[in-house]
Amino acid sequence: MLRFAVLGHPVAHSLSPAMHAFALESLGLEGSYEAWDTPLEALPGRLKEVRRAFRGVNLTLPLKEAALAHLDWVSPEAQRIGAVNTVLQVEGRLFGFNTDAPGFLEALKAGGIPLKGPALVLGAGGAGRAVAFALREAGLEVWVWNRTPQRALALAEEFGLRAVPLEKAREARLLVNATRVGLEDPSASPLPAELFPEEGAAVDLVYRPLWTRFLREAKAKGLKVQTGLPMLAWQGALAFRLWTGLLPDPSGMEEAARRALGV
């Protein structure tokens, strides 16, 4: 039987078990997908168990960056991004990948979001790094903003991007919220309503709540919008393919996540 899990802290409300239960059932595979609460200090011990008994695991906060030092091999893309969200176990060896970046691009394509720049990524943390990397690899001009300007400058220098003030949002054609604003306070948005552009698209990686203030205000401006669920589903589907060689239906995984959210 195939064993999978998501490791992180906290993970009690993770949507990954629901998505991967759908993936296993829809493909006729026998297996389980668990949520293992794993604080940072517990990571080395958990990975020993993964080596012994699991086909693969997903990693979420706060483990994506720390895991690199504990793996036997890390993909070049994950090394550049500096984060691993998917681990494959083969004969006791652990291989690390990042499916957040390709999952983001696949979600845009599936949702009919035009890949037109300039793209402004709000947030220079782990999620922002993956998105900025993906958009740059897709050939877009990428701008980055962060509440702490030094982080935006560091990311811009590392990836060959441009750190900009928030006011440049008016000139962007793709806005991506990769901050936690909206998650911690549903009434908050990282972008004042008057700074949204007149045309383009907006994506929020936050999916609790599903319709954040950022997305509601973008939609009110006439922008094409996408919630955080399609990227969540696509990164999960791509992870599942790395583990099994089979690609589950991302729209089915998204629907499973939506049901688990109760929306």
UniProtKB/Swiss-Prot annotation:
> What family, per the record?
Belongs to the shikimate dehydrogenase family.
Q: Which GO terms describe its molecular function?
A: NADP binding; shikimate 3-dehydrogenase (NADP+) activity
**Lineage of the organism:** Bacteria, Thermotogati, Deinococcota, Deinococci, Thermales
Q: Which EC number applies? A: 1.1.1.25
Q: Which SUPFAM superfamilies match?
A: Aminoacid dehydrogenase-like, N-terminal domain, NAD(P)-binding Rossmann-fold domains
Which keywords describe this protein according to UniProt? Amino-acid biosynthesis, Aromatic amino acid biosynthesis, NADP, Oxidoreductase
Sequence positions that bind NADP(+) = G123, A124, G125, G126, A127, N146, R147, T148, P149, Q150, R151, L205, G228
Q: Does the keyword Oxidoreductase apply?
A: yes
Q: In which pathway does it act?
A: Metabolic intermediate biosynthesis; chorismate biosynthesis; chorismate from D-erythrose 4-phosphate and phosphoenolpyruvate: step 4/7
Checking Pfam families in the record gives: SDH_C, Shikimate_DH, Shikimate_dh_N
- Which EC class, in a word? oxidoreductase
Q: Which residues bind shikimate?
A: S14, L15, S16, T60, N85, D100, Y207, Q235
Provide the active-site residues from the annotation. Answer: K64 (proton acceptor)
Keyword presence, Oxidoreductase: yes
Question: Its function?
Answer: Involved in the biosynthesis of the chorismate, which leads to the biosynthesis of aromatic amino acids. Catalyzes the reversible NADPH linked reduction of 3-dehydroshikimate (DHSA) to yield shikimate (SA).
Q: What Gene3D superfamilies does the annotation carry?
A: Leucine Dehydrogenase, chain A, domain 1, NAD(P)-binding Rossmann-like Domain
Under the heading HAMAP family, the entry gives: Shikimate_DH_AroE
Q: InterPro entries given for it?
A: Aminoacid_DH-like_N_sf, NAD(P)-bd_dom_sf, SDH_C, Shikimate_DH, Shikimate_DH-bd_N, Shikimate_DH_fam, Shikm_DH/Glu-tRNA_Rdtase
What name appears for this protein in its UniProt entry?
Answer: Shikimate dehydrogenase (NADP(+))
Reaction(s) catalysed by this chain, per the record, are: shikimate + NADP(+) = 3-dehydroshikimate + NADPH + H(+)
Q: Which GO terms describe its biological process?
A: amino acid biosynthetic process; aromatic amino acid family biosynthetic process; chorismate biosynthetic process; shikimate metabolic process
**SUBUNIT field:** Homodimer.
Q: Show the GO cellular component annotation of the record.
A: cytosol
